[in-house]
Amino acid sequence: MVIFLYISDNTVRKLLKDAGAGRTSKEARNELKRYLDKKAFEIAQKAVKLSHHAKRKTVDISDIKLAIS
């Protein structure tokens, strides 16, 4: 099992608060954090592959948008 540590607990806490959650459990925050970390990493990997395929060293917005779609 790969553990990603890109998105901070404070970021997830703020996201949930802004979405209307008054209180959140640590388990709930950790689960959302794991999901968001994994999805962000997968998108980043796809974007890098797309930029390499286009023979570019720089990942640009079109790579990210295509990786998300």
Model-derived segments and spans:
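Intrinsically disordered, low-complexity terminal regions
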Residues: 1-69
